Amino acid sequence: MKEVQPIRDTKKIDAMKSIMKGESNYRDLLLFVLGINTGLRISDILALKWGSFINGGGRLLKTGDQLNVVEIKTKKVKSFVINRSVAEALKLYHDSLVSPNPDDPVFSSRKTDDGSLQPITRIGAWQMLNRYANMVGLDEGIGTHTLRKTFGYHLYKKGVALEYIQKMLNHSSPAITLRYIGITQEQLNDIYVELN
């Protein structure tokens, strides 16, 4: 089994988003965009309720608003500001629904016998990601960690200090972060070569 990798090519990321928009799969678009723009674990994304995205005044969060998520694994509160990409995907998805209940899961898959909505499973999220990845020619190394790894990888490529990325991902060392986001020795060697 191949190790899960980040999506390194921004053209592939854009192509996946375009397909999701073209198919009006706004739920999938929000899940994808939220994952690659926040670094949240898939378990935290799938646990989100609509109430998390509504501010005290009853308004849907928009660019610049803060979202607080209690991480399931660490029990720590992760706070971050909603960026434009997340805000746009959130609005598209929210507007495509009929008044979602604040207690409903954002990423629902089906109703149970009692009529309540169930969140999609990790396997469902994995299948969805792989479907879109295959459509753009990414056939291997895609998993639910791909979203979080993609977040870290692109921060690193944009020059964000490794220590910040390490903190954002709650890693214990820079070496763990480099390995997690898929920075290879070959890429590090390229940096040395480019110093001329």
Segments predicted by a language model, with ranges:
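Flexible interdomain linker/hinge and immediately adjacent N-terminus
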Residues: 1-12, 110-116
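Basic, Lys/Arg- and aromatic-enriched nucleic-acid-binding interface segment
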Residues: 10-42
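Short, basic (Lys/Arg/His-rich) helix/loop patches that form interaction surfaces
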Residues: 18-22, 126-163
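Short alpha-helical segment immediately N-terminal to, or the first helix within
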Residues: 34-35, 154-155, 168
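Active-site-proximal segment of tyrosine recombinases
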Residues: 44-46, 141-142, 152, 160-170, ...
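Conserved tyrosine-mediated DNA breakage-rejoining catalytic core shared by Y-recombinases
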Residues: 47-86
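Catalytic-site neighborhood detector that most strongly recognizes the C-terminal catalytic loop/helix
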Residues: 69-71, 75, 169-194
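Basic, alpha-helical nucleic-acid-contacting "clamp/cap" segments
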Residues: 72-112
